[in-house]
Amino acid sequence: MLLLGLLLLTSALAGQRTGTRAESNLSSKLQLSSDKEQNGVQDPRHERVVTISGNGSIHSPKFPHTYPRNTVLVWRLVAVDENVRIQLTFDERFGLEDPEDDLCKYDFVEVEEPSDGSVLGRWCGSGTVPGKQTSKGNHIRIRFVSDEYFPSEPGFCIHYSIIMPQVTETTSPSVLPPSALSLDLLNNAVTAFSTVEELIRFLEPDRWQIDLDSLYKPTWPLLGKAFLYGKKSKAVNLNLLKEEVKLYSCTPRNFSVSIREELKRTDTIFWPGCLLVKRCGGNCACCLHNCNECQCVPRKVTKKYHEVLQLRPKIGVKGLHKSLTDVALEHHEECDCVCRGNTEG
């Protein structure tokens, strides 16, 4: 009987010690979880929403010391003003577990654009400090992950700030009326407009609709237009590599030119002021001629007519005469490599 009593007493004491140890372990885990959630959200399916109206910062746990293992923290910064953006600046003290094969697989911090779910960047290691990141709207998401191995220090700290929206000018490109501008200044002002309607509104604010309607009425003689499209020759037996060289070496390609400069006209304004033309361009590395240096020159040149809006000062009175007109510009249809300077043979 005495032996049975001793066995029961020993079992009870052992159970008490086991329960105390389990309670202690549970308490430690709860304390660790509380520490993690103090600066973010541990569950990756949830996030801590941080409402901001000014500058501030978030950081890895225990920054600038070694961060804990097995951590997932998610923050979503939301600015109070819906019209602002958020800029993130990383502290120079940055260090996470090094990447493997140039990939941040284990410990990393990443920034996500919530509007479309795109990841702006993922960073780890300690080689370079990540650059500034800016949200598209008034919120941005940050996620920090560490695995169960090799925690590093100092972790990271991200400073956030508010970027106010830029004030857009609703006035015309020039504060002076068109009649008070010189032709060169007026040309610069005209260039800033995107559509004919905006341009006519600027030139004739009181009667712009009438001028715009009359602009397209066929009240003037229609000029002939010679839009010449040369046929591109194709060599059927050329090696593919040589064909690629021909395509990307000395060939006609798109260039934008100023109409006033091309026509050498300083007495009038054209809109649009620039047009695309075909001009010879590229290099002549494989020049077939026996010379020290080759240059790419046009071999066949044609004139093409482009219909544009012409603005000419009225004689004797203020204002501009507006009309649609054709301008002839040179287009290079074929190009060739020739010797620059003196040739030999």
Swiss-Prot record:
Gene Ontology biological-process annotations: animal organ morphogenesis; bone development; cellular response to amino acid stimulus; digestive tract development; fibroblast proliferation; platelet-derived growth factor receptor signaling pathway; positive regulation of cell division; positive regulation of cell migration
Induction: Up-regulated in mesangial, visceral epithelial, and interstitial cells after predominant injury to these cells. Expression levels increase in hepatic cells undergoing in vitro transdifferentiation, which represents a model for hepatic fibrogenesis. Expression induced by indoxyl sulfate. Expression induced by angiotensin-2 via EGR1 in smooth muscle cells in neonatal but not in adult rats.
Glycosylation sites: 25, 55
Entry superkingdom: Eukaryota
Gene3D superfamilies: Cystine-knot cytokines, Spermadhesin, CUB domain
Subcellular location: Cytoplasm, Cytosol; Secreted; Nucleus; Cytoplasmic granule
Signal peptide: 1-22
Site (Cleavage): 225-226, 231-232, 234-235
Amino acid composition bias (Polar residues), ranges on this chain: 24-33
Tissue specificity as recorded in UniProt: Highly expressed in the kidney and adrenal gland. In the kidney, it is expressed in arteriolar smooth muscle cells and in epithelial cells of individual segments (at protein level).
Subunit structure: Homodimer; disulfide-linked. Interacts with PDGFRA homodimers, and with heterodimers formed by PDGFRA and PDGFRB. Interacts (via CUB domain) with PLAT (via kringle domain).
Protein name per the record: Platelet-derived growth factor C
Organism: Rattus norvegicus (Rat)
